[in-house]
Amino acid sequence: MRNRTLADLDRVVALGGGHGLGRVLSSLSSLGSRLTGIVTTTDNGGSTGRIRRSEGGIAWGDMRNCLNQLITEPSVASAMFEYRFGGNGELSGHNLGNLMLKALDHLSVRPLEAINLIRNLLKVDAQLIPMSELPVDLMAIDDQGHEIYGEVNIDQLATPPQEIMLTPNVPATREAVQAINDADLILIGPGSFYTSLMPCLLLDELAQALRRTPAPMVYIGNLGRELSLPAASLTLVDKLAMMEQYIGKKVIDAVVVGPRVDVSAVNDRLVIQEVLEASDIPYRHDRQLLHNALEKALQALG
């Protein structure tokens, strides 16, 4: 009997945020509706942060990034969704996609309904689910014991925080929990470690689902050095240990990383180490190379 391929899987789930999750989803977009992204909603910077401070609600920026990278049919709607205002006025720097998502959120019963409306408008087949449908922020305790509030401030810490948490305590989106329960393969990363990857793992229901799932789990490492000082100081082993500390169990079966990553201390896990860089932007994953590496990981995991 041949090993399974990605095309054989009924449910592939990827967790994270920022440009990293969008890149993973776009590399697997051939899976269509069998692909689900669980998206971080704690961003408090840029256009997203301004909207949250003014209007409240969840952070839409990471969701917009994922939708942008999943658009395969250019249209007036997609051009509008990707448009960013210039100039010096009140709208300067705002992304119209963020405003569209926020407007639909006001018109919908749930944020997930707003996302599905936009998915249909943009003809995006992959499922996208916010990690929580309630407003939440990332908080850290620094090495002096001080509370540091928000992703922007946490990324500016000089050293790794003692602890990270979500505030307030919010429930995970029930569809996100169900997606993990039903998954045949789970992917985490790439992305900014503290602010894109960890928030999903800090939700109790998602961590519990990750502890219980029998699905193989793969961590995809970054290709470039993190701009966040505290995250940049972490080794691959540090990151694996921290993720599993918050999940509560050793669950990551494989890592997919570039050739410059030190994997010498990674034990008892499958390591797929290959050239993954895109030719135009070296710190981004080439979609086909990433797809091939994930295929290789799945084959090796059996």
From Swiss-Prot:
Domain of life: Bacteria
InterPro entries the record matches: CofD, CofD-like_dom_sf, Gluconeogen_factor
GO terms under biological process: regulation of cell shape
GO annotations of cellular component type: cytoplasm
GO molecular function: LPPG:FO 2-phospho-L-lactate transferase activity
CDD domains: YvcK_like
Keywords: Cytoplasm
Subcellular location, principal: cytoplasm
Location(s) in or outside the cell: Cytoplasm
Pfam family, any one: CofD
Function according to Swiss-Prot or TrEMBL: Required for morphogenesis under gluconeogenic growth conditions.
Recorded family membership: Belongs to the gluconeogenesis factor family.
Listed name of the protein: Putative gluconeogenesis factor
Native organism: Salmonella typhimurium (strain LT2 / SGSC1412 / ATCC 700720)
